[in-house]
C-alpha cells in the first residue's frame, strides 16, 4: 500500500516538474509539431465527414426521382450528423492516434529530459535512433490493440443497469490510463536498454506510477476537451514519466 501511494504521488507530482523543466530549458519547440498535427487531423476529419455526407446525399438524389419530404430531411440529417460522428470518434481515439504518430518526437523529448536531469549524454546514432523509434511505434501499436480490446470488453458491463455502467466507465478509465502511462514510461526504458519483455516487467512493478501518469493524460479526453490538447499533454506526460522513473530508481 505504501509502495502504491509512493508511485501515485510520484506520478502526479512529476507533472508540474515536467512543465517547469520544459519551460526552463526551452523544450516547448518539440511540442509545436504535434500540436499543429493534432489541429490538422481534427480539421481533416470534420471535412471528411462533410465530404462523405455530400457523397451519400448525391447517391440518394441520383437514385430517387421524386424525393419526398422525408428523404430530403434524411439527406440534410446525414450532412449534419456525419461530421459530428467523425468528430466524436476522434474525441475517443484521438489520444491513441496522437501517441502512435508522435512517438518519435516524444522519444527525443524524453531523452533530452533525462540528459538535463542526470547529465548523462546519449551520443547520436542514426541507426540507434531509428531502432528506438521503431520500437516505440511497435509498443504503441501493441498497447493500443490491448487497450481497445479491453475497452471493448468493458462495454458489455453496460448491460447491467446503473452499477454496470459506472463500473464500465471506471474500468475503461483505469485501463486507458495504464496503457497510456506504460507507453510514456517505455521511452525511458528503451534508453536503459530494456528489452520489450523487461519493459513490460518494469511497468508491472511500477503499475501505479503508470496509472497516475496516464490518468493525467486521459482525464481531459474524458472531458471532451483533451483531444485538442492531446499532443501537448502527451509531450509533458513523456517528460513527467521520465522524471518519476529516475526519482524512483534513485530511491533505496
Predicted segment positions?
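Small-residue-enriched transmembrane helix starts and helix-helix packing motifs
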Residues: 1, 10, 211-216, 241
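Anchoring transmembrane alpha helix of integral membrane proteins
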Residues: 1-25, 29-34, 39-44
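Long, highly hydrophobic alpha-helical transmembrane signal-anchor segments
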Residues: 47-92, 130-156
